[in-house]
Structures are given as C-alpha cells and as structure tokens.
Design a protein with these regions (language model features):
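Hydrophobic/aromatic-enriched cytosolic interaction surfaces used to assemble or bind macromolecules
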Residues: 1-271
C-alpha cells in the first residue's frame, strides 16, 4: 500500500494484535466497485508475547542506561510495566536529556504528583491519580507505569493534545484493558535522532510499548481475554504508510517468528 494513512489502531490480544487503519480515497473507491463499502480495514498479526518479552528483556538488560550523544545526562530504565516515550524534539532547545523517574500508583484512592526540573528550571512532568488517572506533560517526556492492580479502578485518562511541537501522549485505562494513545503532528516520531540515541525511529518507540504491554499480558493477575488497544495518529500524514512501516518494522525485528498475516472478519474487531 503506497498511499498515506492518517491513523492506525492496534488492538492487542493474548495471541497477537489486530490493526485497523483508514483506507485512502482510491482504495475506498476501488472497494466500492467490488461491493465493499467501508473506509477502514482490519488485519490480524499473531505474536508470541513471551518471545517479545524475552527479546526486549535482553535488549534492556544489555542497555539499562542510555546516554545522550555527549554523555552528560543518563536516563535510567526500570523494570517491567514501565514505559518511557520521548517526544519529538523541536530543534536545539530540547536536545539535552534529563533523569526521569515515574510515580507508582498502588490503589484507587492514592494520589501522587511530582515534577522534574530541567537545567533551565522548567517543570518536566507531573502525574496524578485519584479516581481518574491524570497525566499531563509540560516538556518533552512522559512516563507511565502500567501496574495491573490499577486497571480495574481507572475508567479513563484524559487525552492530551498539542503540547508544544512534539508528542502528545495520553493513556486511557478502562475495565478489562487500556489504551495508549500517541498523537503526533508531523513526522517527528519517525526520525527522532535527539531523543532516542540507540533506537531512533517511531517503530522502536512502539516496540518499547509492545514489550511492556507483553509483560502485562504475561502477568498472571491480568485478564488475558481483555484486549489492549494502541492508537497511532499521524496528524499530517506523509507519503509513507504507517501500516506498511509498522509491519515491515515488525518483520525485521522478529525475523524468526511466524508472520501469517490474514484479513480478519470485521466482527473480530468489535467482539
């Protein structure tokens, strides 16, 4: 598929993921001529979550500390269920890294908030939890800890939008699953050389998310029948297909896996 895709939704299940994407006008018209009147398409890709977990566990074990190109500041990567996703950088103003830790949410009534100062003294992160899990980011990074015990409690997280010129990240936790929403204006997620020294593409950001979600799926306290959805939205879709890039990247990463990609009936998605 060569046309641009404006959004891509991944629904993770215990045995893989379904991705649902928008069709281009040309594809929609071609489908209508064949009797298919839809603007969205869904496909299923099987994934061995234990393999994903092992692969990324090895990578993180080998590189627990990632340094910025100048080696001045380190970002520490903790254990499982912890996701750190850097945003796109807007030039020289945000090229420096800073140490980032995350709050731990233990129960429904607990409230936690903290902020992290950059070298210029500006706050970097503030996260809270009380009935609703709320997170907002004021600079370029956000960290969210996925702990299975909070999944039944939080109904949703307020989705974020248009924070500076970089990544806008929201997390929605609902009964029986959680949504991780990445909204990106422009192509910063695809080529973010400043914010991810070793893994420099948006696909690698997604790999990180898949790894930590696989840890959640492998946890015995999680209901494996509950799907997890990831929504990627490219605010200004370019000439490349998000779906095509995703599948190619996954194929490259898991070359020994059995990639039997098949079109699933539409009721699979909504079941």
């Amino acid at each position: 598929m060569t046309s641009a895709v404006s959004s891509l939704t991944l629904r993770l299940t215990a045995d893989g993921f379904v991705y649902l994407y928008d069709l281009s006008d040309e594809e929609t018209e071609a489908g209508a001529q064949e009797g298919y009147h839809t603007r969205r398409q869904s496909q299923f890709v099987p994934i061995d979550w234990s393999r994903v977990s092992a692969l990324w566990g090895d990578i993180i074990a080998q590189h627990p500390i990632l340094s910025d190109p100048e080696g001045e500041v380190r970002v520490l990567y903790p254990a499982s269920h912890y996701v750190v996703i850097p945003s796109g950088m807007s030039g020289e103003q945000d090229v420096h890294w800073w140490r980032l830790t995350a709050p731990i949410f233990a129960d429904e009534e607990q409230y936690y908030s903290d902020s992290y100062a950059l070298g210029d003294g500006k706050p970097g992160l503030a996260v809270g939890f009380s009935h609703l899990l709320k997170g907002f980011l004021q600079r370029s990074f956000v960290a969210c800890r996925f702990i299975p015990t909070i999944l039944p409690f939080a109904q949703r997280v307020l989705r974020q939008s248009s924070l500076q010129t970089g990544l806008s990240l929201g997390v929605e936790l609902i009964e029986g699953g959680c949504d991780l929403v990445l909204c990106q204006s422009g192509n910063l997620l695809r080529a973010n050389h400043y914010s991810w020294p070793r893994y420099r593409s948006w696909q690698h950001h997604l790999y990180q998310v898949l790894y930590f979600l696989s840890k959640v799926y492998l946890d015995s306290s999680v209901d494996h029948s509950a799907p997890v959805s990831i929504i990627l939205s490219d605010g200004t879709a370019g000439t490349d297909s998000l779906v095509g890039e995703l599948l190619q990247a996954l194929h490259r990463q898991f070359t020994t896996a059995d990639w039997d990609v098949s079109v699933m009936p539409i009721d699979y998605w909504y079941a």
